[in-house]
Regions:
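N-terminal intrinsically disordered/low-complexity leader segments
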Residues: 1-11, 198
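Helix-turn-helix
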Residues: 15, 22-61
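Solvent-exposed, amphipathic alpha-helical segments
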Residues: 19-26, 73, 77, 116, ...
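Hydrophobic alpha-helical connector segments
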Residues: 61, 75-106
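Residue-level detector of well-ordered alpha-helical segments, enriched
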Residues: 62, 87-91, 105-109, 156-160, ...
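Amphipathic alpha-helical packing segments from all-alpha helical-bundle domains
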Residues: 68-72, 76, 89, 104-107, ...
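Hydrophobic alpha-helical segments that form the core
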Residues: 109-114, 151-173, 186-190
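An extended, acidic
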Residues: 122-129, 164, 170-175
Length: 198
């Protein structure tokens, strides 16, 4: 069987990472196999180890990609608004939406991976990627809070982002029951009523 070109190998690797990024968000870091990822990428599973030394190496890269995608999406939403409150709402409203709840493969990696991180060693590379991603998103969200007190803004960012992640996680866990929509609505209403300078 002929070897693929370097360009094709790079393209295949990119396809694998994108497929894994989506699948890990949908099913969790430990809810899929190498065979699942390669099938989603449209490739045979035998080629996996030509690209990655282990499933864990792929998980680290794919989770990093998921955080990059979220951070870029937030950056674009923030840049589209002239004032902090409108920008803040542009993060909250889609995050706490039915679409976000029902499409985990395209939404927040924190809500998708938090449960898995409870079982990761504190010094694992995967956990480090997760912590860096959370820090990046928290800083982005916190940049929209302008009380004039940096420590108070940091604390508020921690509370509000935790509420967003928790509400999305609970809404997913209760999907199919009316309480799922209630959770999203209540959290979204509460957060948008706060304003960015309170």
């Amino acid at each position: 069987m002929p070897r693929v070109s370097r360009k094709q190998a790079d393209l295949n690797r990119e396809i694998i990472v994108e497929a894994a990024t989506r699948l890990f968000r949908e099913r969790g870091l430990h809810g899929i196999s190498v065979v699942d990822v390669m099938a989603a990428a449209g490739l045979t599973h035998g080629g996996f180890y030509g690209h990655f030394e282990s499933k864990e190496a792929l998980a680290k890269e794919a989770s990093g990609r998921a955080f990059e995608q979220s951070a870029e999406r937030w950056k674009e939403r923030i840049a589209a608004h002239d004032d902090n409150e409108a920008a803040r709402r542009s993060l909250i409203e889609p995050y706490l939406s039915v679409a976000s709840r029902d499409n985990p493969g395209e939404s927040c990696p924190v809500a998708a991976f938090a449960g898995d991180m409870c079982h990761e060693a504190a010094d694992s590379g995967l956990r480090q990627t997760f912590m860096e991603g959370i820090d990046r998103l928290l800083k982005s969200y916190g940049s929209l809070l302008d009380s004039g007190d940096a420590e108070a803004d940091r604390q508020r960012a921690l509370v509000e982002y935790s509420l967003m992640v928790g509400a999305l996680t609970l809404a997913r866990a209760t999907r199919g029951d009316a309480v799922s929509d209630e959770i999203l609505d209540a959290a979204r209403t509460f957060l948008t009523a706060q304003g960015s300078s309170n």
